[in-house]
Amino acid sequence: MKRVTIQDIADALGVSRNTVSKAINNSDGLAEATREKILQKAVEMGYKQFSYVAALSGSGRFVPTGDSEPPAAASEIAVFTANLSLLSNHFAIPMLDRFKQELSQLGYSFNIYKVDRENLAQHTLPATFDPERASAIMCIEMFDRAYDEMVCTLGLPVLFVDGPHKRYGDSLPADQLLMDNTTGITKLVHDLLGKGIRKIGFIGDYEHCQSFFERYVAFRSAMTLAGVPVDEAFCIKQHSADMDVPLSALPELPEVFLCANDFIAVDTMQALRKLGKSVPGDILLCGFDDAPESRIMTPALTTVHIHTQIMAFTALHLLLSRMKEPYLDYRTVYTATELICRDSTKLTVKEEVK
């Protein structure tokens, strides 16, 4: 079966690709009737995870189709996060907005709890969180493995959106939701190698979380399988606002830096400018997440887009089904992502390596 794309949906409805993308990602600036029409068409055509995670009613809302039961007295879905500040600029915000909308339609309340340093150190719960009121917990930006293991012992359904890295193969006893961290990076590396580029580096702490780890592994695997050695000098694990320090310590710069997310890419671009280097003139740059900043910066940043609305529906499905069937085997689910090539990796014909 042919894979359904955003363009296919746009063609079927006679609207622009950008309009369809806004509807699928729950972006602002779109009439609700138009959004509902597009989402219904996406389900009808079998677009990506929509056919798996939900059916939509005439109102464009999530229909649990047997996955959930009416809320009990404990009807709160709690969200734990160790980094509220990052959530303000993170892909999780549009995902959580949609998630909250759908939960309210099903009769559940929704609250976000900050897990502070003291909680992490002492393995205690946030002061205002009452386990007796909670039906389930969703953890976002929760990368302390020991604390996460404690959360898994509370006797509640737990879903991790991303999570601590599994470098050593140690998984948590809970469901996990991730974005596809491999396909976009693999494709970009393949395309760059096809243009004769060989010096490719990576910036980001691959032990920060599972997503960073998978993006790093995707980069190394793509290089290795193509028979191109990875220059370890071009792999910078450290990330800080002063990226000019590790960059200036390099004997030479690579031709491309792949960054673990867009914010690292933004800091890297600023540091390169301080060193008198331009993107893409002197070096190409790629991020991950498709944060709003990636579209408005100059040059616009090549990145990997996360479909936040699909992640919201998938998270809802995973939590509701776990609440109904607590003894299901633990699941790790990936939602599709999309490589977005912009000016930061743009080569002119003259610049392409022969």
Regions found by a protein language model. Give the residues of each.
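Short, solvent-exposed amphipathic alpha-helices that sit
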Residues: 90-105, 184-187, 210-229, 267, ...
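Alpha-helical recognition/docking segments in bacterial nutrient-uptake
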Residues: 1, 65-190, 246-252, 263
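An alpha-beta-alpha
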Residues: 186-228, 331-345
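Short beta-strand elements in bilobed, periplasmic/extracellular small-molecule ligand-binding domains
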Residues: 103-115, 220-243
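N-terminal helix-turn-helix DNA-binding module of bacterial transcription factors
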Residues: 1-65
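Short acidic capping loops at alpha-helix termini that bridge into adjacent secondary structure
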Residues: 198-199, 230-234, 278-284
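Flexible loop/turn connectors
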Residues: 244-354
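Hydrophobic alpha-helical segments within soluble ligand-binding/sensing domains
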Residues: 175-202, 240-246, 265, 306-324
